[in-house]
Amino acid sequence: MISQISIKTKVGWITAFEQKNKIIKVKFIKKKNSLISNNLKKFRSELNNFFAGKHKSINCRVLLRGNSKQIKVWKELKKIKFGKTKTYGEIAKKYKLSPRHVGKICSQNEILLIIPCHRV
């Protein structure tokens, strides 16, 4: 069963979807809250602290759903510190992929903000 929480932020509504107590998707939409777990409550707190400037990342339990290349790239994105960026080329070189392939993998990231594809 998938549960969800919607949070109003200064950039609009953000909804996190969870399955098996792990976040599987974050979208910029508003949905009706359902079965709010401790992990979703933590996401709400982390998100609010992130936008308040108290935290530099959002740390919650996530379930990465993808192939091995996607998961490697997404884990690499998670390592990019707040205020820093990397290029598609830098990540591609590390995993012997083309920059376009890395770009495509970034576009398939469903866990926005937690996996910071906006830093690439």
Predicted features along the sequence, with ranges:
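Basic nucleic-acid-binding alpha-helical/helix-turn surface characteristic of O6-alkylguanine DNA
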Residues: 1-97
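Short Lys/Arg-enriched helix C-cap and helix-to-coil transition segments
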Residues: 113-120
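Residue-level detection of the helix-turn-helix DNA-binding "recognition helix"
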Residues: 107
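Acidic, glycine-rich catalytic loops of TOPRIM or P-loop NTPase phosphate-binding modules used
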Residues: 110
